[in-house]
Amino acid sequence: MSTIRLTILIDYCGEIVEIVPFLFDIIQETHKDIYKETTEEIVKGNSNEGQSISPPPHQPSTDQADIEALKDSYDDFLYVSKAFASCSINSLIATARIYGLNPAPIKGARVLELGSSCGGNIIPQALYYPEATFTGIDLSSVQIKHGNELIESMGLTNVTLLEKDIMDIDDDFGTFDYILVHGIWSWVPDIVKDKILSICNRNLSDRGIAYVSYNTYPGWKRLEQMRDIMLYSEKQLKSQSLQERTVYTKNVLKLLGETMNMDQRSQERSGYKIANINSVLASNDYYVGHEYLETFNDPVYVSEFIERA
């Protein structure tokens, strides 16, 4: 079976300065209610001369516990579901035709979205394209429930949301003309990454298009520095909810940005770094939490993705 795979790349660029050593002393002093029992552990963790403050690189696990943890995370801290123009059916068809391909027509098309959340990306398309059918799956029962309530209230009959693990999709699930995977691939364990690519091969129709977005290098080399700072600053707060940890780490970045702004030389040399901090601070908490504080965020070079696919 011949398939069409179009890869849409999301390339984030940013950079963060090395953290000021005394910054955590200030943070601990101003957040005694949270850090009252952690000072000893932080000092112990920095006892070696020249030791890096960044956490060790995450080693992806294939344990089912990681998948369950992701489900709990999105159940507890909902990710607001939105429509993305880049993976709308008309956009994918137009892009395919530009490259000389002959994609499946919208009429009668079957569309599958992996990690659909509340359906914010496919419900508008189901409304706009009544002759196509849409199926979204997501681990989060809470998000699926919200999405189905919206579908019912709108009286739509051509879109379905299912609480389902990507790992459970097999050949019997059927084939689809369009498979959408927006904001999922970089944020799941390797075993799920491989399963996504398998679905894009085995469950894609002959004239199908698979859309996969992911974080890429080299742009994310810079943002990983910011992620390291956030992970380090919240590593003693694992008993707190993701939402609480997100608020806390944004305050850390705010303090870092204010500290840099106090120094004229930093402003002149690192204005773009301050801008990156401000960009995170201006972002919604649900985005920052799931983007920077989840267990998995694995950017790759485009060539690496192509080799893996």
What are these regions (language model features)?
Residues S140-V142:
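Conserved SAM/SAH-binding beta-strand->alpha-helix loop
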Residues D76, F84-A109:
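Conserved alpha-helix/loop element of class I SAM-dependent methyltransferases that forms part
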Residues T133-D138:
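Conserved SAM-binding motif I beta-strand of class I
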Residues G155-I166:
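Conserved SAM-binding strand-loop segment of SAM-dependent methyltransferases
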Residues I209-Q240, L255-R265:
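Conserved class I S-adenosyl-L-methionine
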Residues D194-D206:
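A short glycine-rich, Lys/Arg-flanked "PGG" loop and its adjoining helix->strand segment in the class I
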Residues C118-E131:
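Conserved SAM-binding loop of SAM-dependent methyltransferases across substrates and taxa
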Residues D170-I179:
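A short acidic, Gly/Pro-enriched loop at the edge of an enzyme's catalytic core
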